[in-house]
Amino acid sequence: MALIHGSVPGTSAVRLVFSTSASPSRFCLNVPVVKQGWKNSCRRRVLRAMVQETVQGSPLVYAREMERLSAKESLLLALKDAGGFEALVTGKTTNMQRIDVNERITSLERLNPTPRPTTSPCFEGRWNFEWFGSGSPGLLAARVIFERFPSTLANLSRMEILIKDANAKATANIKLLNSIESKIILSSKLTVEGPLRLKEEYVEGMLETPTVIEEAVPEQLKSALGQAATTLQQLPALIKDTLASGLRIPLSGSFERFFMISYLDEEILIVRDTEGVPEVLTRIETPSSTVVETIEYDS
C-alpha cells in the first residue's frame, strides 16, 4: 500500500512521501484551512481521503481535493465581499457582485464530493442562508418586508433552517423599531425523489410572540408599550395562552416546491429550484462541534 502524507502548515510547501508498493493506496493529508466565513477565524482542519487507486492516480485525487477547498474558500470570500445577507435582502448587491458569486457557485458545484446528497447524513443539521437568487422564495419574502417598511422600522437580521428526520423548519428573525424581536417559522416535510432531488411540502407557518428589549425601546414608545402590556394582562387566560404560543397558520396542501442539491459537504449546502435559481447555506456550528472533516473517495 502506498502512503501519501501531505502536511500544509501555514505557508509552507506541500510535502508528499510515496512508498514503493503498487497496491491500492491510502491517501491522507493534513490541511489547515483559513475559515473565511463571517467569523474570520483561523482553525486547523484535518482532511482524510481514502482512495482505492494506484500510486500513479493518487496525486490527481490530491489535486482535485485542493481545487475543491480553494473553490469553497473563494465562494465564501465572494459572499463576504458582496456585503453578506443584509446587502442581499436590501438589494444593495451590484450586478458585478452577483455574477461573481454565481460564477464561484458554479465552480464549486462541479466539485461536489457527495454523490447522493439527499440521503447523506451531512444534509441534516442547522443551516444559515447566505445567498438567494433573484427568484428565490426567501429573497422575495425578505424584500417584501424591506419594501413595506424602512430599515429603521423593520429589519430581517437572519434566516436559518433546521433539517432533521425528513422535516425542515425555516426561521426568519425580524426586529421592529430596533427594540421588538419576533420570528416567523415555516415548517415543511421533505420527500426524497432521487439522489439529488427533493419535494418540499409546507405544513405550517407560525408568528412567534414578539419579545421586547426594554432598554432599546425609544422614549416616545415606552408609554404605549406599557399600556399594551397592561391590556394583554387583562385578557382571558385562554386568549393569553394562545398569544403566548404564537399565531399558527395551517398550510398543509397549500404550497409545495421541488429542488435539487447541487453541492453538499460538512460546511456548505447549495440547492437549486425548478428555475435553476441557487441558494447557498452554511452550517451553523455548535460549541461542541468538531473541526474535523472526513471525506471518502472510492474509485
Curated annotation (Swiss-Prot):
Chain segment of the transit peptide: 1-48
Keyword Cytoplasm: no
InterPro entries: PAP (IPR039633), PAP/fibrillin_dom (IPR006843)
Locations listed in the record: Plastid, Chloroplast, Plastoglobule
Presence of keyword Transport: no
Keyword annotations of the record: Acetylation, Chloroplast, Plastid, Transit peptide
Domain of life: Eukaryota
GO CC terms, sorted: chloroplast; chloroplast stroma; chloroplast thylakoid; cytosol; plastoglobule; thylakoid
Family stated for the protein in its record: Belongs to the PAP/fibrillin family.
Name of the protein this chain belongs to: Probable plastid-lipid-associated protein 13, chloroplastic
Organism of derivation: Arabidopsis thaliana
Lineage: Eukaryota, Viridiplantae, Streptophyta, Embryophyta, Tracheophyta
